[in-house]
Each structure stands twice: as structure tokens, then as C-alpha cells.
Amino acid sequence: MKRTYQPSKIKRKRTHGFRARMATVGGCKVLARRRSKGRLQLTV
């Protein structure tokens, strides 16, 4: 049985990256929350 986490930089960026977040309403809300909280790193 293989492990569930198979790291891939491309997949990581495409699903959790900044542009992926900006593409949806929910993603924009995520970024807004993280900005208001003062996170230094908004996305991956």
C-alpha cells in the first residue's frame, strides 16, 4: 500500500496557490481572512 501523501510542487501550487485562491469567491475570502489575521504567508 502506498502512502497518501505523494509530494508534487505543481499539484501543490495548482490547488493551494495564490492564483487558485483568487479564482474562486471562497478562495478570496480565505485570503481576506489571512490578511486580516496578519499572516506573513498567504498561500503556499
From Swiss-Prot:
Name any one Pfam family assigned in the record. Ribosomal_L34
The record ties this protein, via PROSITE patterns, to: RIBOSOMAL_L34
Q: What processes in GO biological process is this protein linked to?
A: translation
Q: Where are the transmembrane segments?
A: none
The source's superkingdom equals: Bacteria
Extract the InterPro entries matched here: Ribosomal_bL34, Ribosomal_bL34_CS
GO molecular function annotation: structural constituent of ribosome
Keywords (alphabetical) are: Ribonucleoprotein, Ribosomal protein
Q: Which GO terms describe its cellular component?
A: ribonucleoprotein complex; ribosome
- PANTHER family, alphabetically? LARGE RIBOSOMAL SUBUNIT PROTEIN BL34M (PTHR14503:SF4), MITOCHONDRIAL RIBOSOMAL PROTEIN 34 FAMILY MEMBER (PTHR14503)
Family named by the database record: Belongs to the bacterial ribosomal protein bL34 family.
Q: Which protein, by its recorded name, is this?
A: Large ribosomal subunit protein bL34
Lineage per the UniProt record = Bacteria, Bacillati, Mycoplasmatota, Mollicutes, Acholeplasmatales
Q: Which gene encodes it?
A: rpmH
